[in-house]
Amino acid sequence: IQYAAIKAYSEDHSEYLENSRLILKMIGDYIYKELSSVGVICQKPQGGFYMICDFSNVVNKTHEINNDKTLCQKILNDIGFAMLPGSDFGMEEDKLLSRIAFVDFDGSKALKMISKEKPSSDNFLDLTCPKIAKGISLLKDWIISK
């Protein structure tokens, strides 16, 4: 194991890390732009693979949706889009906050594509992240219908 660690730490991983960051930035920017366009207040991600979104401006509290947990459950039941309630991460439950992770894509395919050329984000997302694009589209349609 120690020899494996020496090998792993001796290689230059800078291109892999740069490309991984670029992929996640492109996905995060896309989700931010799309959800912001329908009034969801999102914290633009600075790195990582998730963002916090506030649905208070676009979803009215009702008997069916009265906190972040019921919001997430309703969206999951209605359109099959999974996100976690903000209260799972220490935020107030009565706020309509959620954490959306953007990890449902083929990372190997995305890395290969980004290494060959720096594609436009829309083309890249269509080719490597179709489930994310479809999920965000369904979520936007759900919000608009409310």
Which residues make up each language-model segment?
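PLP-dependent class I/II
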Residues: 1-146
